[in-house]
Design a protein with these regions (language model features):
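A short glycine-rich, Lys/Arg-flanked "PGG" loop and its adjoining helix->strand segment in the class I
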Residues: 220-232
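Conserved alpha-helix/loop element of class I SAM-dependent methyltransferases that forms part
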Residues: 108-140
């Protein structure tokens, strides 16, 4: 395979080297707003010379406490040291629980293991294959950020792409590498950090990432890195969790909050098991966390973390179409689409919904926000690139952390 330039391939968690895209001076004091959900809240406004952006809601009586919760546009951790701490937590979680590995009981690293994972993945996510377009990647230099157990990796390789994987965890790198060994496929596998990709500028024709970049503290920085490693004219295909989704706005904000009260009793755990069909072990872990600190569990950021990828997941974020597009301001031909509907979001009736209606619901209020974008063929000075007007919508859901 081609020797793609690699820089600091072993620096899994490097220190911050670049200023944050959205750092501003002249922040204003928090201002009060009314709450949709009853509790007194403050909306925090940031003002620059040309625009203002409301970025957070803080449930607190103290302006000082509100100020401490300001988290800008997907850069969800305010200090470099805290950012590194959170990233280590993320790394540890996914090292112990590689993406999708919990959906099979087959021995890890066996052909049956990979086969069962793929059957489940593409049954649950039928739109994924068309969103990526593997058949169009022959001969392209493809980078996947966050390879998981290698389902898409294998499809890229079999389509003739010159495939490279980078993942924060050694577990995912090893599992995907083993898959390639079993299939006689060629690829490159590197443990590295999406916020500081270990590749030279312009190394790839396509950068793909499915459900990964919303788990890193500084998502805007990862998008800048995607832009950097793409060759002129190269494409990015990225999936992030969708803020304006039924899952976030209804399931997490309302249904899961009500379920938390149900999980406080033994009978409630049994009832929840019948309604949501989740593993009892997972429900009991939720119950333990609720018992330890009910208020902390019901904090919206914690609700998002613990009810997306497992009760011990340390970090998830959600993005609107607008906030996602703003992160891709350096690109052209930016297009978004929404996919994925889970029948379990409507307990009791979800599985009765016809597939045609389910597909429509997914296209409107689905959980997966896909962003398709292309790097400009010619470098343009930053002040000549049209940036979208600043949104007054909170950007990532660390930007809407509710502090009890």
């Amino acid at each position: 395979m081609e020797n793609i330039g690699v820089r600091d391939a072993h620096a899994v968690i490097p220190s911050s080297q670049h200023p944050d895209l959205y750092s501003k001076k002249g922040f204003t004091a928090p201002t009060k707003v009314s709450s949709m959900f009853g509790a007194p809240q403050r909306r925090i406004a940031i003002q620059s010379r040309n625009s203002s952006l409301e970025i957070g809601v803080c449930r607190s009586k103290s302006r000082e406490a509100c100020s401490e919760s300001v988290l800008v546009a997907g850069d969800c951790v305010s200090s470099p040291s805290h950012r590194t701490h959170v990233k280590r937590q993320v790394q540890s979680f996914w090292q112990n629980s590689p993406c999708d590995s919990w959906f099979t009981n087959e021995a890890r690293g066996t052909p049956a293991f990979y086969r069962s994972l793929d059957e489940h993945r593409y049954k649950v996510h039928p739109g994924l294959l068309s969103a990526v377009g593997f058949e169009r990647t022959r001969g392209l230099r493809v980078l996947e950020i966050g390879c998981g157990c290698g389902s898409e990796a294998e499809r890229f390789a079999r389509a003739g792409a010159r495939y490279t994987a980078v993942d924060l965890t050694n577990a995912a790198v090893s599992i995907t590498q083993r898959r390639f060994q079993l299939g006689g496929l060629e690829g490159r596998f590197i443990q590295g950090d999406a916020e500081d990709l270990p590749f030279a500028d312009g190394s790839f024709d396509l950068v793909y990432s499915h459900g990964v970049l919303h788990h890193t503290p500084n998502t805007p920085r990862t998008i800048r890195e995607v832009h950097r490693v793409l060759a002129p004219g190269g494409r990015a295909v990225i999936m992030l969790y969708h803020r304006a989704s039924f899952n976030y706005q209804v399931n997490l904000r309302v249904v899961r909050r009500l379920r938390a009260h149900l999980l406080k009793t033994e009978l409630g755990i049994k009832v929840a098991r019948k309604i949501w069909h989740e593993p009892e072990k997972e429900l009991r872990r939720h119950a333990d966390l609720i018992q330890q600190d009910p208020d902390a569990y019901l904090d919206m950021q914690n609700m998002l973390n613990r009810n997306t990828d497992g009760p011990d997941n340390p970090l998830s974020q959600v993005f609107s179409r607008l906030s996602a597009s703003e992160m891709f301001w350096q690109f052209k031909n930016v297009r978004t689409e929404v996919m994925f509907w889970n029948p379990n979001w409507l307990p009791g009736i979800g599985k009765l919904i016809p597939r045609s209606i389910e597909n429509w619901l997914a296209s409107q209020w689905g959980w997966h926000l896909w962003i398709h974008a292309q790097k400009r063929c010619l470098e343009v000075a930053a002040d000549q690139v049209h940036r979208p007007a600043r949104s007054r919508i909170p950007q990532g859901v660390h930007a809407e952390a509710l502090v009890g």
